[in-house]
């Protein structure tokens, strides 16, 4: 496929995103993993797209995000960039693409920028990841942090559950947010953090955009998993998701109708296939003799 025709809007940039924050205009952010979905998200006016390692679950059928590889992420991000040339695209650093060392983190962040045309990268973790953030930013790559529920370490956190409900844990998240900001993160995603904890972090942010995924309305913007919006992930529906339309039901209905029409010889109809003229068909039969 070729690159989608760009929308007329100007592509969001770091300055324009910070201007939205200054003007109290919430930032819209969705996950995306493929060309056609990226095209529609750009046409809808979504500010940012996250090519999340959640693709391991939503697109590849794994039970966690851990199996996603850098090659998986690059290939899907390339498709998204072609579909949304005028949208701010963020590449999600997959498991073990940044944890081993600062050098590994910089190298893989660079792949997102050079091979996939990303505008920024995101990685999970708190204070322990500040040196990775700092190294990536020093290399000239915009970097986002991710706190609260961090799916790559969900097992250590006790599963997919709210983080920061206790005062001590909430304090650690607040401290980590400030540390990531000081390390150079321009955005921090708070996933499944209590709303008032998110509000405290947002109010304390000086030069950092705070985004919410299930963390309430007080952040500078919202992120949702695209498949959750339309009932496209059959294994479970997160409480934090809002279903804006059940595309899964529509797709299933269409698939069942297709199977029924083929098995009963009602598809294809004349408008669904191509024919050869009688003259050319007669010539073909003569050639075959």
Model-predicted regions and their roles:
Residues 2-289:
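Alpha/beta enzyme core
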């Amino acid at each position: 496929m070729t690159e989608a025709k760009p929308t007329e809007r100007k592509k969001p940039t770091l300055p324009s995103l910070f201007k939205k924050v200054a003007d109290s205009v919430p930032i819209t952010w969705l996950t995306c993993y493929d060309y056609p979905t990226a095209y529609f998200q750009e046409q809808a006016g979504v500010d940012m797209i996250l090519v999340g390692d959640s693709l391991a679950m939503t697109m590849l059928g794994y039970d966690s995000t851990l199996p996603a590889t850098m090659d998986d992420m690059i290939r899907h991000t390339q498709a998204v960039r072609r579909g949304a040339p005028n949208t701010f695209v963020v590449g999600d650093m997959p498991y073990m693409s940044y944890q081993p060392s600062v050098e590994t983190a910089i190298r893989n962040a660079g792949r997102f920028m050079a091979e996939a045309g990303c505008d920024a990268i995101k990685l999970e973790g708190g204070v322990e990841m500040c040196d990775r953030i700092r190294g990536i930013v020093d290399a000239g790559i915009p970097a986002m942090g991710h706190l609260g529920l961090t799916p790559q370490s969900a097992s250590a956190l006790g599963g997919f559950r709210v983080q920061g409900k206790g005062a001590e844990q909430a304090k650690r998240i607040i401290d980590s947010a400030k540390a990531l900001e000081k390390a150079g993160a321009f955005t921090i995603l708070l996933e499944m953090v209590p709303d008032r904890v998110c509000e405290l972090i947002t109010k304390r942010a000086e030069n950092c955009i705070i985004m919410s995924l299930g963390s309430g309305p007080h952040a500078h913007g919202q992120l949702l998993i695209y498949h959750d919006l339309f009932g496209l992930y059959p294994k479970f529906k997160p409480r934090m998701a809002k279903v804006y339309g059940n595309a899964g039901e529509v797709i299933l209905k269409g698939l069942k109708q297709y199977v029924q029409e083929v098995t009963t010889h009602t598809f294809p109809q004349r408008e669904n296939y191509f024919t050869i003229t009688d003259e050319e068909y007669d010539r073909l039969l003569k050639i075959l003799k």
